[in-house]
Every structure is written in C-alpha cells, then in structure tokens.
Design a protein with these regions (language model features):
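Conserved Rossmann-fold NAD(P)-dependent oxidoreductase catalytic core, especially the SDR/UDP-sugar
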Residues: 92-139
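Alpha-helical substrate-binding/gating segment
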Residues: 184-192, 198-246
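Amphipathic terminal alpha-helices
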Residues: 295-325
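NAD(P)H-binding glycine-rich loop region in Rossmannoid oxidoreductase-like domains
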Residues: 42, 46-89
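Conserved beta-loop-beta element that borders a ligand/cofactor-binding pocket
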Residues: 113, 148-171
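N-terminal Rossmann NAD(P)H-binding glycine-rich loop of SDR-like oxidoreductase domains
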Residues: 1-22
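Terminal hydrophobic/aromatic helix or amphipathic segment near a protein terminus
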Residues: 239-289, 325
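NAD(P)-dependent short-chain dehydrogenase/reductase
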Residues: 160-162, 166-200
Length: 325
C-alpha cells in the first residue's frame, strides 16, 4: 500500500515499484486524481482505497491484505498559523500508517522523511545516522517529530526503512513538480540566484523512486538512507540553469545573513502581499546553510546511481516549458 501517489515523489515511486513487478494499492482521498497524475506515467491505478491518513480505521482497512507500505503523505503548510494543525495531522498519519503497519506485521515499512529532519546550522555533511534535529519552522518540526516516532519503531525492532531526500527535481507527475520544481520556476522568472555560501541539494525524483523500490525486500530489518543528491553552489546553479534554459541567469553575491533576514520579514508580511514569494525564513535557513549529502551507503548497498544534476535540471526545465510555465 502506498499513499501520496498523486504527488511528485509518490507518483514516481509508485511507477518504480510497479516497474519492479510489485502490485500497488493506492491510498487516496480523491480517486479521480489518480487519472490525472500517476496514471500519466503508465501505472495501473485500478486498486485503490479511499481514505484520509488521519482516519485510523479506514487506513487499517486499506492496509489489510498488503505485504509492505510506503508512507510519504503529509500536510505541508508554510503559514505559521497552520503549524499546530500540521503537527497533529502529520503525527496522526504516521501513527495510523506506520504504527498499524507494524501491528499487522508488514515488512518492509518505508517512511519517506526529508533532509530537514536532520538539518542543523553549520552541518557539513548529511548522513542517515545523524541525531534528529529539524529546522525551526513548522514543517521541519513536523518532520523531526515523526522522525523520532519512526526511529522509536526501529529501536523496537520493526522493519521500518527511512529515506531522507534532498531537493527533488525531475519530470512531473501530471502537472506536479514538487516544491523544488517551483523553485526552478521562480528562479527562471527572476533570472537571478542570490547568495554567497548558499546552495541547492539536487536529487532526481527517478533516483529517489528507485531507492524506494529497492527497499521493498523483506527480512532486512530497520534501515536508513540519505538521498540528498548533489550540492550545487550558487555560481554553478546559475550557470546550469542559464545553459539548459538558454537564458541569462545571474549569480548575485547577496550576504547569506541578509537572505535569512529577508525570509523572516517576508514571513511576517506574506499574508498582506498580493503575490506569493519563494523567500521564507525556513527556506532561506536551509538554502544558505545547505550541507553536502553522503549517499554512498545506498549506492554501495542498493546499487542506486544518482544522475548528473545538470540532466535533472534540464529535464525539469523542458517539462516546465512543455506545460507553458
């Protein structure tokens, strides 16, 4: 059973799982969205269960008859006023999906976390066995809380497998590009990449999906893997975007501290602005202090190959233009 399959990472993960010969049951709130998302990748979406991850009984019914589960569904809210609801909804979802999967003896149980659960300022390199930290924003806090819960299941011996993707880019699922894809769209619109020590941590959605499919092997016990991808500093990022998009992109050495201040100010002003802005306090915290990612364990143990970020960015830009963005 898999949830979040109408989204970007979830849709590509479902395709990788199906391509590996597994049958997928889709947990969805609106089954009509399957046809406009993951089905566009050529995946059979006939087996689905209609449920919300916050509904314990309906989740359990969806889990019955399945051998394994991939859980990546989560409420994402950038408005600080929504933090409390996000924390409670996402924790309930983790308990209902991961917790009940453990009760039912499912193996493996894959939980898709985020590099933000491990992030802290001045961290040089991400690795899967770092202690839980999480950003200061609501989303980072939510990921950290669920991470603590999932690791508790691991400590008890449950076959929970946790992954930590970076900024996921690549071709869309229907019209879903994910948050990092929206970052590409914004950068191309502005023609400017600001920052001095800032960077993106780019991983291809197809490589993340391949990792999730590779984890669907029973009897391996609890495991954790980063899938951060490649750290691309501002000058290189501007060069790649400019070349693949055939446009002028400028790397502007704005002090990183100024970007963090701007993010905080725009968080406060956001509700009163007539437009959406990619600058948030949390986003600037991650962007200006982005670490490297040690993905060698998944490369060595699971045979995952992380493709050239230039190819990933090029595929993203091509697809954005194909949709008229």
């Amino acid at each position: 059973m898999q949830n979040a399959t109408t989204g970007f990472v979830g849709g590509w993960t479902a395709k990788a799982i199906a391509d590996a010969g597994h049958s997928v049951r889709f947990l969805v709130r609106n089954p009509a969205r399957l046809k406009t998302s993951v089905a566009k990748l050529g995946v059979d979406v006939s087996d689905f269960a209609v449920a919300d991850i916050s509904d314990r009984d309906s989740v359990r019914e969806a889990l019955n008859g399945c051998d394994a589960v991939v859980h990546s569904a989560a409420l994402v809210a950038t408005d600080p006023r929504e933090t409390s609801r996000m924390l409670s909804t996402n924790m309930a979802g983790a308990q209902n999906v991961l917790g009940q999967a453990v009760e039912l003896g499912m193996d493996p149980i894959v939980h898709v976390s985020s590099f933000t659960a491990l992030f802290r300022p001045n961290l040089a390199t991400l690795s899967a066995d770092l202690p839980v930290a999480g950003g200061t924003d609501g989303y980072g806090q939510s990921k950290a809380q669920i991470e603590i819960y999932a690791r508790g299941l691991q400590d008890a011996g449950a076959p929970v497998n946790i992954t930590y993707p970076g900024m996921v880019l690549g071709p869309p699922v229907g019209d879903q590009f994910g948050e990092a894809g929206e970052g590409v769209r914004s950068a191309l619109w502005m023609h400017v990449i600001p920052g001095r020590g800032a960077a993106w941590l780019i991983v291809d959605v197809r490589d993340v999906a391949a990792l999730h499919a590779a984890l669907l092997e029973s009897g391996r016990g609890p495991r954790r893997y980063t899938a951060g991808g490649h750290r691309i500093p501002v000058p290189e990022l501007a060069k790649i975007l400019g070349e693949v998009a055939g446009t002028t992109m400028l790397a502007v050495p704005v002090p990183d501290s100024a970007l963090r201040v701007a993010g905080s100010v725009l968080d406060q002003a956001g509700p009163y602005l007539p437009f959406n802005t990619p600058f948030t306090a949390a986003g600037m915290q991650y962007y200006t202090q982005m670490p490297e990612s040690d993905d060698s364990p998944s490369e060595k143990e699971l045979g995952i190959t992380y493709r050239d970020p230039r190819d990933t960015v090029a595929d993203t830009v091509t697809a954005l233009r194909g949709l008229g963005s």
